[in-house]
Amino acid sequence: MSETHFGFEKVDETEKAGKVAGVFHSVASKYDVMNDLMSGGMHRLWKMFTIAQANVRPGHKVLDIAGGTGDLAKAFAKQAGPTGQVWLTDINESMLRVGRDRLLDKGVVTPVALCDAEHIPFPDNYFDLVTVAFGLRNMTHKDAALAEMRRVVKPGGKVMVLEFSKVWKPLEKAYDVYSFQVLPWLGQKVAGDAASYRYLAESIRMHPDQTSLVRLMEQVGLEKVEYFNLTAGVVALHVGRKY
């Protein structure tokens, strides 16, 4: 049997998806509140930067993978307009339900679907843009997921990955204290779940750093891959193109 990591813990590959699902079933109802608290609201700026770089136009088709509570999908739906198509997808039903309801509350009607990023249920060369924000690190086979994203994007289209990354070295010690002490404490106080936020910190440390993710995206056939460090590398936006 093959092993992978669930945070720092080694688990069988067949177990990881279920463990990750448990985390997000637990945190779904408090997800947005915790994002604001954990990042000091910075996650909104990171997403705004991603939206600007995406450059979605009227009529575009966009796939938002692991779209959670729908921040990106909401913006893309407004930009793509009635002639476009924006799909909000997530592998976690609890997160998808929260995202769907949140979009409806904002008056945004867009299709939603349960979707495993390693087996995307769309044809080749279908979307102008595929995005995944804060989801790739939770996937068991990141290379397979990225290959699927490349498959469904059109020639000339983009795959964009917004994800926690390798922080600037002088900040590492302070960031570790925050990640492994403050985050679980916040998770317990606000969401009643310290363990899920301990996993969050661990999963960030196990995720490929900026240059490693560039190589991984290139290995699946994406080209002209570049990245933008945000907030001293706490987060990075990677952009790959298909030709």
Curated annotation (Swiss-Prot):
Class of this enzyme: transferase
Pathway in which this enzyme or protein is active: Quinol/quinone metabolism; menaquinone biosynthesis; menaquinol from 1,4-dihydroxy-2-naphthoate: step 2/2; Cofactor biosynthesis; ubiquinone biosynthesis
GO biological process: aerobic respiration; menaquinone biosynthetic process; methylation
UniProt EC number: 2.1.1.163, 2.1.1.201
Residues binding S-adenosyl-L-methionine: 69, 90, 116-117
UniProt keyword list: Menaquinone biosynthesis, Methyltransferase, S-adenosyl-L-methionine, Transferase, Ubiquinone biosynthesis
Coiled-coil intervals, chain numbering: none
GO molecular function: 2-methoxy-6-polyprenyl-1,4-benzoquinol methyltransferase activity; demethylmenaquinone methyltransferase activity
A Pfam match: Ubie_methyltran
Record's catalysed reaction(s): a 2-demethylmenaquinol + S-adenosyl-L-methionine = a menaquinol + S-adenosyl-L-homocysteine + H(+); a 2-methoxy-6-(all-trans-polyprenyl)benzene-1,4-diol + S-adenosyl-L-methionine = a 5-methoxy-2-methyl-3-(all-trans-polyprenyl)benzene-1,4-diol + S-adenosyl-L-homocysteine + H(+)
Described function: Methyltransferase required for the conversion of demethylmenaquinol (DMKH2) to menaquinol (MKH2) and the conversion of 2-polyprenyl-6-methoxy-1,4-benzoquinol (DDMQH2) to 2-polyprenyl-3-methyl-6-methoxy-1,4-benzoquinol (DMQH2).
Family stated for the protein in its record: Belongs to the class I-like SAM-binding methyltransferase superfamily. MenG/UbiE family.
Name of the protein: Ubiquinone/menaquinone biosynthesis C-methyltransferase UbiE
Organism: Cupriavidus pinatubonensis (strain JMP 134 / LMG 1197)
Gene responsible for this protein: ubiE
